[in-house]
Curated annotation (Swiss-Prot):
The keyword RNA-binding applies. The keyword Transport does not apply. It comes from Mycobacteroides abscessus (strain ATCC 19977 / DSM 44196 / CCUG 20993 / CIP 104536 / JCM 13569 / NCTC 13031 / TMC 1543 / L948) (Mycobacterium abscessus). HAMAP family: Ribosomal_uS12_B. GO terms for molecular function: rRNA binding; structural constituent of ribosome; tRNA binding. One of its GO terms (cellular component) is small ribosomal subunit. Belongs to the universal ribosomal protein uS12 family. It comes from the Bacteria. Part of the 30S ribosomal subunit. Contacts proteins S8 and S17. May interact with IF1 in the 30S initiation complex. This is Small ribosomal subunit protein uS12. Transmembrane segments: none annotated.
Length: 124
């Protein structure tokens, strides 16, 4: 416990908040190459086969990224755009792949929340 005089002389040091998306190096998105595309199972109360990919980013970091939406066309060596955002029931998955950009196609037959999944407006 510092004395009042020590606080007057030096003050208190601010705590530095830990960055949640360190691999993006401060960028909103990063380009990367898929090194492995596979499925994994979620944490305890949930049950599914979640689609994920190991991606080597342009920042030379390899991360695990979630592939959102139903169905995808990704395979090894696909170029993808990665953004921050974790998947709560997949431990260690702190990034998501942006649908509809680079080699990633948008979700087919998507009617609602289309911009999130790179789906074009249907011609009526």
């Amino acid at each position: 416990m510092p004395t009042i005089n020590q606080l007057v002389r030096k003050g208190r040091r601010d705590k530095i908040a830990k960055v949640k998306t360190a691999a993006l190096k401060g960028s909103p998105q990063r380009r990367g190459v898929c090194t492995r595309v596979y499925t994994t199972t979620p944490k305890k109360p949930n049950s599914a086969l979640r689609k994920v990919a190991r991606v080597r980013l342009t920042s030379a970091v390899e991360v695990t990224a979630y592939i959102p939406g139903e169905g995808h066309n990704l395979q090894e060596h696909s170029m993808v755009l990665v953004r921050g955002g974790r998947v709560k029931d997949l431990p260690g998955v702190r990034y998501k792949i942006i649908r509809g950009s680079l080699d990633t196609q948008g979700v087919k037959n998507r009617k609602q929340a289309r911009s999130r999944y790179g789906a074009k407006k249907e011609k009526s």
